[in-house]
């Protein structure tokens, strides 16, 4: 039944049938927790890895003892950093100890290691004034992966890859003769027995005794041409280091450094965890038949008798007793299974060691050694602590390698299983913390080299840690990561949802990940393990589809980086769903049967139905209720936040839902936000967690409210918290950020309660669009191809009006010829053009500007020529005044206009940090109010997008029986073929809810049914079918059929026509081809491409075609002559040769082809070089807008040259006022073809 639910300050009528049993986690905790881990533990790990650094003789030792982030010395606040273009960071100080072993002297010092970027409370970083997000990366987890291919005869050939976090790979493969080969670090393959010999089993006999007498292994040994350990070592050395003289010692040290040196080979905690999970003997022998008695060597106890089936519990006990090799019977063959000798330490020690906090399995032989040598509890604990790196090795060990070989052999007998690399149990997340840690490690290892060199060179007595450490490599690595890594992205700040989604994004791209070109279909596809972890719907359309995903709503990331999702635990004995909620990783979940969240339960939590629909990996089964292990916590568990905001998602086709999710992120914040009448109930949580709303840090009473700040008197100590609100700030995408208080003086607020609305929020709920009265009706063809017909009311009443703020900056630099100056005194500018410029030369706040208006007056010294006698005299009399300057003022760009809302001035004198060579920096902010207009893109939440085709007067729109006109008409043909029926249900329910005065919550997969909607319509006094008689606004006559009318939530997207429309008459040209540049940003022309040429050819429009391909494009002389002819009113001359044709000829000549162009009389046509053309143009005394170089002013400024932009032509020609006599009509203009 429909029931009221309090969401923030608003009550919604909810249609949810499933009670929320689990709280949704904080939606940006993936960012916050990861960074916190880095500061608390990650940094410590990196320093620990690199400790100690000693010189080559070993008598100087440098150690990092501890570190602190100096939070009291943060230079600027977050807001100041954005204003001043600096990085929000705190100084990192490291305590360093230097020990001289010869003299025994120890020096300790605190060393400053650079400013370390800090994460803001919203989970972002401020880097050089720009807000950035570090996207989490999905990578293949380190571990052992088995696979198989089928050969021509249908035989399975198994292969394996051992992937460390960093270090050499091991790859196993089988050929069709059953010989198993190994590749070490991508080199040529060797029989696997060679690796076994090198690891210690020299003879054939030893190998067979250890691995068991198995056909494949025997075949491999036959193929092997080495017979001893030494031969095997030399063979491996030859493969890895061809061309070097092989010796046994060098081979041993090579293998040791490749695999058994923690600095060169790192499995990481995850790798060790995955190795132990895959190779542990327990899981592999479970459910097999024992071929011999399995005996505990220590006690002599028989754990499993010969011929018995090994149960799961037995298998686990066998493993924890340290038995590492078990013979099992498979089809009358004895197969030996070898584990990697790791055990659960808690099962091997008979006293409590929980204070050691060991959660991983440990290496049994090392543990046995400790237990055999010591008996005292405290001593054993001490020894365990000391030997931690041996008990839980970071690198691979021999036991691991033997276990991988054994697993490879066993696969042929169905012992073990092959892996699916797209399974989320085999893919993990690297979040901010880990990515930063890796970057820091790179910086430190570069620094380590420098430290070692300095230790060798400098005087060992006088040296201090400060002199040894060079922080540059560390600072550079961090700076490079934040500034230019593929995973450090400029935050999408269009609206709160886009911000939130960006922080929850998972990318498979980036360093160490996939590349778009290499990624196949499998990696991109939806996988059963994504359920509740990654959204199957929200992903970009285009080349990145499936490679960039979004975290599901309830998902969390565990300590190993695997994504977990919560389930309710079912007590199988009672057949009851308990209140316990546990988080499962993808491979843990695979062992259970999971029921849906909407499975009906009685009041005791028992299943009502005898048969229950469950998921088992990718299958959907119906099983007796007693077999169910787990149950989903919520129906929206499998989708992401943006997708969970689409009402009636279950009635939409997936590809349209994808578009709906993506387009919500592009919705522009409107002037007056309104929450959707038909929502899903997640809007409040999304807005609160996104970080755009100020929340009360402590409970208390509101004592002061203004547009700019809210003050809350704390309940605990009576102090006052002040919350400053952002007013009309520019977001990263140029939309407007403005916060409005929603509490009143005297209100009591709780901790975490929302105090003010931000952009696109209404009473703390996300409000991306507007509730619009619309109908599915065609109107005079204006609905063709998804176009939308809108009422003038939407324009007049500012329903879809948004504010956009653009920022422009102007720098005054030092040039070779003297400093630039910001001034009101600009040469050749009328007083009228300076009417809004103040005495400093900067525009006043509140001025209305159009394109071409001056924002900041700036003059640059001109290049000097030899002075004449008169000029020297003037210079002597008037001093510097007569020096030549050029106008290089900042003007409003083409096509922009608006009102100046803010001006900021930064100068050297005020102590502002400016980049080198800059003396003064002025920033102007121009705001525009953009009303909805023809050509703007609008969309609903169901992927139903369209462009506005016409704005119709209100009185002409179709109107309802009560006289209310529709606000938007949509094409009914846009619904059936697209299969997004959710929009129709939304319209019906919205129609009923608006009449009843309700706000609705209809959660995804658990929302209102068709009957519910019909009941609401009836309650509101409408037809149960939701259709209404409409009349034509022009004639007043009824339309033939009834029309579906209702309220739809419609968004205005960030694709505004004002940003896209563009026109050019003359402008910059490309340097090589001399054709106009392309694109609005370059002030380019429209490309007349291949197909357009065909069109003109088809019509036989020869002269038009010739003109387009020559004088309107790249006939350099011709275009100037044409200009001259138009000015003089003469006929347009014959076109010349296009520059691109000359370039083609030159390119052919560069290939040593002798190319000549002949005219009708077979005489060669001589081309002029571009330089000669330039002379000719100079004679014409006309310079149309210059080359592409002249548009990139900064490029020239970098070099410090005083240059002359194309706009200031030396003769200062003003095109409009050219006197016709300026063109001498007897110019000798040669034609290129004579």
Curated annotation (Swiss-Prot):
EC number(s) given by UniProt: 2.7.7.6
Transmembrane segments: none
One MF term in the entry's GO annotations: DNA-directed RNA polymerase activity
Gene Ontology CC terms: DNA-directed RNA polymerase complex
Catalytic activity: RNA(n) + a ribonucleoside 5'-triphosphate = RNA(n+1) + diphosphate
Keyword Repeat: no
Sorted UniProt keywords: DNA-directed RNA polymerase, Nucleotidyltransferase, Transcription, Transferase
InterPro entries: DNA-dir_RNA_pol_bsu_external_1 (IPR019462), DNA-dir_RNA_pol_su2 (IPR015712), DNA-dir_RNAP_su2_dom (IPR007120), DNA-dir_RNAP_su2_hyb_sf (IPR037033), RNA_pol_bsu_bac (IPR010243), RNA_pol_bsu_CS (IPR007121), RNA_pol_bsu_protrusion (IPR007644), RNA_pol_Rpb2_2 (IPR007642)
CDD domains: RNA_pol_B_RPB2
Pfam families, A to Z: RNA_pol_Rpb2_1, RNA_pol_Rpb2_2, RNA_pol_Rpb2_3, RNA_pol_Rpb2_45, RNA_pol_Rpb2_6, RNA_pol_Rpb2_7
EC class (word): transferase
Signal peptide per UniProt: none
Record family assignment: Belongs to the RNA polymerase beta chain family.
Subunit description: The RNAP catalytic core consists of 2 alpha, 1 beta, 1 beta' and 1 omega subunit. When a sigma factor is associated with the core the holoenzyme is formed, which can initiate transcription.
Role noted for this protein: DNA-dependent RNA polymerase catalyzes the transcription of DNA into RNA using the four ribonucleoside triphosphates as substrates.
HAMAP family the record matches: RNApol_bact_RpoB
Protein name per its UniProtKB record: DNA-directed RNA polymerase subunit beta
Biological source species: Clostridium perfringens (strain 13 / Type A)
């Amino acid at each position: 039944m429909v029931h009221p639910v309090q969401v923030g300050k608003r009550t919604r009528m909810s249609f949810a049938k499933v009670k929320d049993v689990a709280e949704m986690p904080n939606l940006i905790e993936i960012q916050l927790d990861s960074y916190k881990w880095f500061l608390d533990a990650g940094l410590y790990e990196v320093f620990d890895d690199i400790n100690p650094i000693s010189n080559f003789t070993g008598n100087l030792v440098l150690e990092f003892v501890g570190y602190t982030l100096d939070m009291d010395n943060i230079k600027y606040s977050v807001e100041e950093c954005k204003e001043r273009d600096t990085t929000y960071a705190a100084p990192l100080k490291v305590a360093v100890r230097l020990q001289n072993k010869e003299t025994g002297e120890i020096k300790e010092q605190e060393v400053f290691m650079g400013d370390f970027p800090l994460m803001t409370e919203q989970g972002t970083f401020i880097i050089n004034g720009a807000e950035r997000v570090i996207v989490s990366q999905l990578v293949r987890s380190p571990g052992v992966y088995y696979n198989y291919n089928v050969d021509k005869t249908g035989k399975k050939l198994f292969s394996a890859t051992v992937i460390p976090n960093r270090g050499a790979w091991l790859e196993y493969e089988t050929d069709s003769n059953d010989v198993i080969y190994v590749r070490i670090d991508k080199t040529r393959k060797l029989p696997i027995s060679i690796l076994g010999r090198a690891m210690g089993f020299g003879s054939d006999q030893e190998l067979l005794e250890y691995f068991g007498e198995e056909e494949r292994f025997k075949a491999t040994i036959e193929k092997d041409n080495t017979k001893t350990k030494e031969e095997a070592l030399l063979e491996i050395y030859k493969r890895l280091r061809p061309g070097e003289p092989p010796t046994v010692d060098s081979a041993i040290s090579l293998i040791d450094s490749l695999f058994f040196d923690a600095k060169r080979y790192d499995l990481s905690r995850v790798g060790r965890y995955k190795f132990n999970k895959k190779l542990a003997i327990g899981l592999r022998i479970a459910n097999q038949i024992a071929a011999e008695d399995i005996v505990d060597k220590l006690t002599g106890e028989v754990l499993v008798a010969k011929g018995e089936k090994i149960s799961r519990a037995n298998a686990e006990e066998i493993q924890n007793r340290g038995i590492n090799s078990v013979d099992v019977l498979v089809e009358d063959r004895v197969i030996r299974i070898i584990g990697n000798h790791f055990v659960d330490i808690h099962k091997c020690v008979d006293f409590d060691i929980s204070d050691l906090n060991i959660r991983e399995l440990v290496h049994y032989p090392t543990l046995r050694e400790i237990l055999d040598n010591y008996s005292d509890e405290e001593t054993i604990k001490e020894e365990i602590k000391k030997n931690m790196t041996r008990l839980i090795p970071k690198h691979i060990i021999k036991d691991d390698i033997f276990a991988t070989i054994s697993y490879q052999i066993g696969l042929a007998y169905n012992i073990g299983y092959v892996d699916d690399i797209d399974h989320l149990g085999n893919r993990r997340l690297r979040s901010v913390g880990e990515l930063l840690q890796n970057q820091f490690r790179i910086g430190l290892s570069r620094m380590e080299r420098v430290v070692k060199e300095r230790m060798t060179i400098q005087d060992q007595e006088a040296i201090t840690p400060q002199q040894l450490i060079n922080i540059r490599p560390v600072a550079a690595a961090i700076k490079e990561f934040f500034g230019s890594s593929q995973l450090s992205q400029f935050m999408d700040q269009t609206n709160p949802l886009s911000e939130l989604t960006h922080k929850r994004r998972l990318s498979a791209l980036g360093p160490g990940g996939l590349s778009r070109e290499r990624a196949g279909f499998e990696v991109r596809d939806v996988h059963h393990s994504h359920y509740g972890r990654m959204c199957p719907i929200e992903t970009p359309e285009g080349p990145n589809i499936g490679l960039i995903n979004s975290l599901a709503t309830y998902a969390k990331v565990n300590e190993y980086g695997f994504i977990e999702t919560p389930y309710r635990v079912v007590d199988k004995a009672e057949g009851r769903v308990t209140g316990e909620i546990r988080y499962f990783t993808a491979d843990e979940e695979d062992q259970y049967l999971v029921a849906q969240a909407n499975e009906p339960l009685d009041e005791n939590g028992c299943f009502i139905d005898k048969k229950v629909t469950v998921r088992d990996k990718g299958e959907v089964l119906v099983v007796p209720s007693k077999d169910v292990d787990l149950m989903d916590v919520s129906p929206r568990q499998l989708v992401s936040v943006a997708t969970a905001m689409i009402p009636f998602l279950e009635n939409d086709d997936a590809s349209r839902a994808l578009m709906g999710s993506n387009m919500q992120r592009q919705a522009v914040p409107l002037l007056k936000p309104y929450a959707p009448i038909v929502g899903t109930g997640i809007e409040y949580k999304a807005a609160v967690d996104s970080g755009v709303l100020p929340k009360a840090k402590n409970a208390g009473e509101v004592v002061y409210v203004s547009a700019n700040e809210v003050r809350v008197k704390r309940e605990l100590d009576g102090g006052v918290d002040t919350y400053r609100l952002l007013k009309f700030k520019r977001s990263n995408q140029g939309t407007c950020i403005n916060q409005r208080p929603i509490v009143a003086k005297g209100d009591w607020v709780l901790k975490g309660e929302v105090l003010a609305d931000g952009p696109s929020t209404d009473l703390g709920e996300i409000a991306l669009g507007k509730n619009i009265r619309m109908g599915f009706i065609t109107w005079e063809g204006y609905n063709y191809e998804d176009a939308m017909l809108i009422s003038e009311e939407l324009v007049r009443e500012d329903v879809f009006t948004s504010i956009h703020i653009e920022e422009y900056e102007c720098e005054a630099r030092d040039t070779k010829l003297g400093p630039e100056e910001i001034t009101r005194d600009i040469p050749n500018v009328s007083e009228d053009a300076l009417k809004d410029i103040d005495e400093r030369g900067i525009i006043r706040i509140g001025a209305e500007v159009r394109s071409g208006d001056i924002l900041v007056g700036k003059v640059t010294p001109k290049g000097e020529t030899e002075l004449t006698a008169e000029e020297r005299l003037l210079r002597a009399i008037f001093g510097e005044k007569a020096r030549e300057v050029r106008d290089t003022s900042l003007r409003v760009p083409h096509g922009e206009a608006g009102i100046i809302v803010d001006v900021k001035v930064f100068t050297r004198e005020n102590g502002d940090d400016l980049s080198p060579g800059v003396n003064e920096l002025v920033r102007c902010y121009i705001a525009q109010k953009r009303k909805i207009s023809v050509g703007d893109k609008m969309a609903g939440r169901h992927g139903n997008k369209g462009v506005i085709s016409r704005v119709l007067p209100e009185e002409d729109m179709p109107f309802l029986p009560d006289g209310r006109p529709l606000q938007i008409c949509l094409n009914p043909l846009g619904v059936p073929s697209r299969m997004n029926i959710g929009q129709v249900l939304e319209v019906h329910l919205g129609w009923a809810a608006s009449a009843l005065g309700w706000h609705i919550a209809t959660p995804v997969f658990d929302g209102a049914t068709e009957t519910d909607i019909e009941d609401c319509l009836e309650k509101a006094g409408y037809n149960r079918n939701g259709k209404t008689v409409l009349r034509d606004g022009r004639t007043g006559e009824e339309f033939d059929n009834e029309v579906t009318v209702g309220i739809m939530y419609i968004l205005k997207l960030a694709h505004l026509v004002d940003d896209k429309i563009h026109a050019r008459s003359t402008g910059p040209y490309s340097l090589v081809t001399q054709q106009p540049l392309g694109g609005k940003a370059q002030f380019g022309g429209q490309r007349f491409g291949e197909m357009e040429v065909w069109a003109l050819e088809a019509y036989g429009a020869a002269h038009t075609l010739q003109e387009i391909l020559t004088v309107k494009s790249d006939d350099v002389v011709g275009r100037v002559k044409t200009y001259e002819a138009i000015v003089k009113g003469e006929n347009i001359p014959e076109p010349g040769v296009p520059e691109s044709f000359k370039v083609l000829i030159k390119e052919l000549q560069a290939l040593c082809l002798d190319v000549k162009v002949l005219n009708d009389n077979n005489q060669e046509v001589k081309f002029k070089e571009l330089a000669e053309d330039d002379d000719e143009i100079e004679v014409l005394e006309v310079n149309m807008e210059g080359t592409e170089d002249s548009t990139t002013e900064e490029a020239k400024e970098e070099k410090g040259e005083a240059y002359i932009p194309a706009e200031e032509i030396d003769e200062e020609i003003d095109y409009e006022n050219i006197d016709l006599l300026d063109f001498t009509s007897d110019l000798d203009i040669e034609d290129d073809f004579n």
